[in-house]
C-alpha cells in the first residue's frame, strides 16, 4: 500500500473518531437536558400539589461568607476603647481612656466634629468605655469611674444617667423634690464625690446628697432590634436587659428598671468572669463575650443557658474576647484583644460555626494591637477599635 493511501486512511479514521466524539457529546447534552426538564417538571408538579417556597437550586452570592477587606483608618484618638455609629451612619462615636478621656465624634471621612465627656468630672474621675446609640440617635455611654450609664443627645449634650437597675438621676431628683423639678433644670451626678449638682432656672448651683444605691458597675451596652438595652454588669457578673419602653426620654423620670437578668460569678457553664458585651441574634438568643473565661456563651430569650463556644485550640479559639457585634446575617464578630484579631462565627443554626478571622499583631494598615471593640453599620462597614495603635480601623464587606 502506498504512503498516500495510508495517509488517506489515517485521515478518514481521525474524521470518524471526531464524529463519534461529537455524537457522544450531543447525546450526553441531550440526556442532561432531559434530566433538567424532569427535575423542573417534578418541582412544578410538587408546587401545584402543595404550594410552598421551592428549594434554591443555586446559592445566592450574598450568602457566601468571606472576610472583609481593610478600607482606611481614623486617627486623632488616644487609647480608644469603645465605638458606635449613628443610625444614619453619618457619625462615629469613640470613647478614649487616654488624654482627656473624651467621647469624640467623627464623620465618615475621619474628620473630628466635636467631643463631650462626663459632666462635672475631672480626668481622674471619669473613664468612658462602651457606647451604644439608640434608634432616635441618643448616645448611651458606660463610665467605670462613675458606675453609671450616661445618656446624651446626638451632639453630646447630657440628658440623664442610669444609676442602677431601677434608678435614673431624674427619677431620684423627682422623688427628692416632691415631683417639683422646674422645666429647664440642669443636673449631673459625681459618684467620686458623692454629690448631685442641681441648677434651677435663675438660681445658682446646689449640691444635694447622693442617692442611696446598691453597688453596680455597668460595662457593656448594646441595643437589640426592638430597642431593648442589654447591659453587662461587672459587680455581680451578670447581664441585665432594660425594655425599650423604660428608656424613652419621657419615661426616664419614672424609670421602671430591668425586665430580665441572668448570670453569676464563676467559671462554670452558666457563669461569667468579666462579661463585656451582650448581643442578640435573629432568633432572640443572647450571646455574651465572657472576657476572662475566654469564650462566648449563648442564652435563650428568657435567660436560660444554652451553650458556650470559642474555647479550645485553632483559629476559632478566643483569648480575651471584648467587644462584639451581630450583623444581619447572624455573623457574630468578636474583638479578641490579646489575639490581636477579629474572629467571626455563624450563629444562625443550633450550634455556632467558626467562619474566619482577620487581622494580626502589628501597626501597619490592617493589623491590630489590642482591638477592644467593633460595630457594623447598615452598609456593611466595620469600625474596629485598635487601642494601642490609637486609631479606629474601617473595613468593608
Which residue stretches match the model-derived regions?
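A short helix->beta-strand "capping" segment at the edge of beta-propeller domains
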Residues: 54-78, 206
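Short loop/turn segments immediately following the C-termini of beta-strands
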Residues: 97-98, 144, 192, 234-235, ...
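Short loop/turn segments that connect beta-strands within beta-propeller blades
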Residues: 107-111, 153-157, 200, 243-247, ...
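Blade-level signature of beta-propeller repeat domains, shared across WD40, Kelch, NHL, RCC1
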Residues: 369-397
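Beta-rich, blade/repeat-based domains predominating
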Residues: 75-87, 121-135, 167-183, 211-224, ...
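A short beta-strand motif characteristic of beta-propeller blades
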Residues: 69-74, 112-122, 160-162, 204-211, ...
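Conserved beta-propeller blade signature
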Residues: 91-93, 138-140, 187-188, 228-230, ...
Amino acid at each position: 500500500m502506498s504512503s498516500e493511501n495510508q495517509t488517506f486512511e489515517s485521515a478518514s479514521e481521525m474524521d470518524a473518531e471526531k464524529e463519534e466524539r461529537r455524537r457522544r457529546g450531543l447525546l450526553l447534552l441531550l440526556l442532561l437536558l432531559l434530566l433538567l426538564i424532569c427535575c423542573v417538571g417534578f418541582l412544578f408538579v410538587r408546587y401545584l400539589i402543595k404550594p410552598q417556597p421551592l428549594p434554591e437550586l443555586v446559592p445566592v452570592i450574598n450568602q457566601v461568607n468571606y472576610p472583609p477587606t481593610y478600607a482606611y483608618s481614623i486617627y486623632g484618638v488616644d487609647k480608644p476603647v469603645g465605638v458606635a455609629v449613628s443610625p444614619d451612619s453619618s457619625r462615629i462615636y469613640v470613647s478614649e481612656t487616654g488624654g482627656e478621656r473624651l467621647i469624640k465624634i467623627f464623620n465618615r471621612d475621619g474628620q473630628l466634629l466635636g467631643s463631650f465627656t462626663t459632666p462635672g468630672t475631672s480626668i481622674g474621675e471619669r473613664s468612658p468605655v462602651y457606647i451604644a446609640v439608640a434608634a432616635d440617635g441618643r448616645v448611651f455611654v458606660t463610665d467605670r469611674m462613675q458606675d453609671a450609664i450616661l445618656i446624651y443627645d446626638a451632639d453630646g449634650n447630657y440628658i440623664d444617667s442610669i444609676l442602677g437597675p431601677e434608678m435614673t438621676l431624674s427619677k431620684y431628683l423627682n422623688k427628692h423634690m416632691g415631683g417639683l423639678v422646674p422645666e429647664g433644670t440642669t443636673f449631673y451626678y459625681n459618684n467620686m464625690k458623692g454629690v448631685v449638682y442641681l441648677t434651677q432656672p435663675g438660681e445658682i448651683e446646689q449640691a444635694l446628697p447622693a442617692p442611696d444605691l446598691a453597688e453596680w458597675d455597668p460595662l457593656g451596652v448594646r441595643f437589640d432590634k426592638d430597642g431593648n438595652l442589654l447591659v453587662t454588669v461587672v459587680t455581680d457578673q451578670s447581664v441585665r436587659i432594660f425594655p425599650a419602653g423604660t428608656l424613652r426620654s419621657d419615661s426616664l423620670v419614672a424609670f421602671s428598671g430591668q425586665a430580665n437578668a441572668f448570670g453569676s460569678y464563676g467559671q462554670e457553664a452558666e457563669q461569667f468572669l468579666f462579661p463585656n458585651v451582650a448581643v442578640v441574634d435573629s432568633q432572640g438568643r443572647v450571646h455574651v463575650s465572657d472576657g476572662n473565661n475566654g469564650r462566648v456563651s449563648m442564652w435563650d430569650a428568657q435567660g436560660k443557658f444554652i451553650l458556650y463556644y470559642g474555647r479550645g485550640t485553632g483559629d476559632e479559639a478566643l483569648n480575651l474576647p471584648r467587644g462584639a457585634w451581630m450583623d444581619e446575617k447572624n455573623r457574630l464578630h468578636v474583638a479578641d484583644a490579646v489575639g490581636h484579631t477579629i474572629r467571626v462565627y455563624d450563629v444562625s443554626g443550633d450550634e455556632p460555626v467558626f467562619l474566619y478571622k482577620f487581622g494580626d499583631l502589628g501597626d501597619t494598615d490592617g493589623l491590630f494591637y489590642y482591638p477592644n471593640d467593633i460595630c457594623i453599620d447598615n452598609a456593611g462597614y466595620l469600625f474596629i477599635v485598635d487601642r494601642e495603635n490609637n486609631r479606629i480601623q474601617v473595613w468593608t464587606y
